[in-house]
Amino acid sequence: MMADPRSSDPTAARDNGGDSDACPVRAVVFDFDGLIIASESNAVRTWQDLYARFGLTLSLEKWSTLIGTWDAPWAPAAELRESVGNGHDWDAIEAERRALEIAMSQTLPALPGVIERLDDAARLGLGVGVASSSGREWVAGHLTRLGLLDRFAAIVTRDDVTRTKPDPELYTRALAELGVAPEHAVAIEDSLHGVVAAKAAGMRCIAVPNPLLAHADYSSADVRVDS
């Protein structure tokens, strides 16, 4: 079961060992995949099915290293090509897989609590942003489909930066667009890569562990919310 990543009040996040009263929260920045929509399961399912088509197995443990980043040390497409070899139209095969993932994701709702936390942020006058290692077309497309695009003053994706999470660039760019210093901002993240990025940017961070990473060490986050 997916945890409600927005069940904690963003203003309640404390810097480890710090005092939030001295640094009031003025902005909240959401991750996207796994936080606003539960898209990770479709991605891993389509890749696992493709691996199985060629008699191979893609473990959840290995897949989990990709969650939250576009700069992982391995890529499923490259690994599959290397393992299976030539004689296949890999571009067409991968395009077919991607099209299936996109189609499966078109009916995904906003995760429980998203609308409520956005309403809370509006009521409190907080700046709201998205910082995602996914592409802009993917993120903005789903936000538009959900009727949420105009709820975000800053939308920063991998298309806007040179490095994705765990590098802090996505978050520093989002904060610059919001005009808020990192000590006055909270990130909400489901991945370890995302938590590392948020903390490196100088933000407080609420971690809602992705189900694939539920047993990982999220101690660097300021708050952890489990299902």
Kindly give the residue locations of the regions a language model identified:
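Conserved SAM-binding loop
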Residues: 36, 110, 128, 163, ...
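Asp-based, Mg2+/Mn2+-dependent phosphohydrolase catalytic module
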Residues: 2-26, 119-122, 135-227
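N-terminal helical cap/lid subdomain that shapes the substrate entry/recognition surface
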Residues: 21-124, 137
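Residue-level detector of anion-binding/catalytic polar loops
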Residues: 57, 127, 204
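Short glycine-rich loop/turn motifs that provide flexible caps or phosphate-binding loops at active sites
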Residues: 33, 67, 128, 193, ...
